[in-house]
Amino acid sequence: IKDATPEKLYILNSNPIINQWTYTGGLSLKKLIRDGFINLALSRNSFDNHIDRYEDNELKLPSQQTLAYQSRETENKFRLDVNLNKKGWKIAYGAVIQLAEYENNTFNVLRKELRDINNNIIQPAVTVNFSSPLKNFWRYGAFAQISKRFSDNRMGISAGIRSDMNSFTTDGNNGLQTLSPRIALSYVLADQWTLNASVGRYYKIPPYTILGFAD
């Protein structure tokens, strides 16, 4: 590194080398029906993440690598929703299903091995080294929402419910256990003042990095 200083070298070698890429693609089909429309969507998104760190991030010697993290998250989604407008009531309901794919290979040196002048180990190395055991699994759910405005559009009310299930967790197929109801109210007090209130309960499956961790 040009004009290297201890501070610059420390920053260079303490920060990992990160290489990421992502893509999203899909298509949708909309069909008009009486009082609304049906929307059908198919999509795929993927996120690839590589993180490496060496004792010397410029030389990048394999024998000096202290962190090697490679992961990829891919979701293939199919969504169907129906949207209606009847007598001022906006109604939406539908279902979604997706195939989740996750890969993770992790090597991390938490503590290096230390030896004395006689080559005896005085501090054993501590490392994390695993390949994620998480297999491809399904995620699916259904939802419904209804909303309307009253009093010359000054007051609005919205209510909804959804359930998210999966084929991975122990109780993942129990839709009643993952119900997420919510309700929201809004009232226009003046041109620039609106009072909002909402309450709900939300269920969310842990991220793939947690689901795919191995000790």
Residue ranges and their predicted role:
Residues 5-11, 57-61, 122-124, 212-215:
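Short glycine/proline- and charge-enriched loop/turn segments
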Residues 2-8, 48-50, 187, 191-215:
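Surface-exposed extracellular loop regions of Gram-negative outer-membrane beta-barrel proteins
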Residues 176-177:
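Exposed beta-sheet edge and beta->alpha loop/turn motif
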Residues 1, 18-172:
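Face-selective signature of the C-terminal outer-membrane beta-barrel domain
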Residues 180-186:
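Short, well-ordered alpha-helical packing segments
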Residues 13-17:
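Non-catalytic, glycine-rich low-complexity segments
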